[in-house]
Amino acid sequence: MDFIEKLKEKSIKKKNVSTSEALELFVEGTGNPYRVLAAASEIREHFKGKDIILCGMTHLISAKCTQECTSRASFHSNPDHVSAQKIKTARQVLAEAVQAKKNGAEFFSIITGSEGLKTKKAWKNICQIIPAINKSGIKPCLAAGMIDANQAAQLKAVGLLRYCHHLQNDGKEDRAMMNAVKAAGLSVCAGVSFGIGETFTQRIQSAEVLRKLNVDAVSINMIDSGSENKRDRAQTLSPMEILMTVAVFRFMLPDKDIKLCGGRKNNLRQLLPLGIIAGANSLMTGNDLNATERNSKLDHEMIADLGLIPTREIDLCTCDTKGKQRCAASSAIKSRSLV
């Protein structure tokens, strides 16, 4: 049994893959990338089956960055860079959630930015929106920067399922907050961003932090290679390096949801389907954190072509029968409980 196979079996048995082993795996993958991707796919299927989770999202606050942030993740973690323009109404957000459900999303994330819940009006607005989203039949998530234990408990009480937060470099305050959120009974999705000048060792260290935090899901964001707002410190990652990063995360976080988010379309390009083969079991659909639109039907088509199953299917029929008859491209909407 060679190194890749041994590490795959170790991961499937939920024995921690060390940071040194993860780095060696990455080096091994530069010479045998498809073997590493195939092994990561086996780990994904062992823990997640053939299900692929789709997520929708909206920005509650329409804003712009004054410092040319390299990604939406850094944009929302730097409140001094943000110039707020408009707050969406509860009705607008609910309409977007309903549309996300129609697009096959299982989860719907509201992103407010770091300043999102610092006013009573904003807090009241969120506490009204979350129950409404729940009633619509899609699972509500929230990304609103730093919150305390009392706020986490209140969000849980009004029906929030998952809190999303981007992991910063130092991470001390982030880790404390994520633990408080988990203690309140909320699921935690931690975001990480790559392509901002970090080394691969730093990516592995991020995975190690997330493993210690025992988060439920990880959203992977990549600096958008098609964006004009890139700082000098940003780097362009090749599709294969991104795939190897996803694969190593699957080895280190074998039973967690791993979601491809910001920059997935422009950075992975024609290799986007391999992001799932590399170990991802979740996708941001409709749009992503870099605001590059991708038709949700393309995601469903891609999932079907891979022989996998979206947790909420949509009708892909585009023939002239307009739904009156079932065709080979048509599928019934299916909802499944996922927590």
Language model features by range: what are they?
Residues M1-G31, R211-V339:
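Auxiliary Fe-S-binding modules of radical SAM enzymes
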Residues L23, C55-T58, H81-V82, S109-A122, ...:
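Glycine-rich, proline-tolerant flexible connector loops at the mouths of alpha/beta enzymes
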Residues R35-N78, Q85-S109:
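N-terminal pre-triad scaffold of radical SAM enzymes
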Residues A39, Q128-S136, Q154, V158, ...:
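Alpha-helical structural signal in soluble globular domains
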Residues G56, P140-A143, A190, I258-G262:
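Conserved hydrophobic beta-strand within the GNAT/NAT acetyltransferase core sheet
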Residues H76-E96, A100-M177, V181, L186-I196, ...:
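Core AdoMet radical
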Residues A122-Q128, R175, R203-A207, L237-I242, ...:
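Charged helix-capping and loop-helix junction motifs
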Residues D148-A157, G197-L210, N266-A278:
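Catalytic cores of alpha/beta
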